[in-house]
Amino acid sequence: YQHVKAFPRYISATHSICEDLEKRRILLENLQDEENKDGDHPKLWKNFAMALGADEKEIENVTLDWFTKDMIDNFFSQARKSYAEGLASLYTYERQIPEIAETKIQGLKKFYGVSSKEGLEFFEAHKSADVIHRAECEKLLDSLSKEEQEKAEQASMYTARYLWNFLSGMTSKHKLETIAA
């Protein structure tokens, strides 16, 4: 939840250092999707967690594990370094989300009996919206200079590492079985 709650601020940080109006508008559209007044994404995540039996106050007050804090700190760091690095960090995450969202929807239905709108809406929203965000980020990344693309690639690698550490940390914390594909 804490990562989902912070995500609009990653976008906002990158948006604020982007000098090109047209590029900022694209980031702004993404930010508006995240903070939609009828269903901001942190609220949708809370609804998902509550559909699984979580308490709303506990969701807000959970103590961050080191791997979650490190991931969030990396996103903020990349988002504030440069437009290219912030954009690449956002892309690294959003690139994979539509397919992950679909897999999560199937798993939540099959293994956890989650079928309510509230329980699935976060993933339904990301299944479609992030296809658009991914394509927009790709166009923006393609428009970077060679030097900016090198910075973006490095930022993407850092972000991927922090995402991996986060997932590994969750797997270890909850003693989940891992199966290599």
Name each model-derived stretch.
Residues 1-181:
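Non-heme di-metal
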